[in-house]
Amino acid sequence: MAIKFTQTSLDKIEKIIQESGYVIRYERGNFQSGYCILQAKKVVVLNKFFQIEGKINTLIDLMPQLIINFDALTHDSQKLYDEVMATAKEK
């Protein structure tokens, strides 16, 4: 199933990351990849100038790099996480 590029999809993907204890911040920056991960503080900083599609793609790309506690996720988040990870592996 393809992930739709809507605000609702973005909110759901953000929820997965937040349920794992990470803080997502949207800020200006000159990161080449469009994001920066501060593992020690569990902070993910994304380029605030990205459109919704760019934000979703960036979160999908970086999710395999994050430490996600699958058991701490809600049932809906677990299903979406599996879907996102399958999408990330296809890339």
Describe the residue ranges of each PLM region:
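Post-HEXXH active-site segment of zinc metalloproteases
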Residues: S33, E53, L66-K91
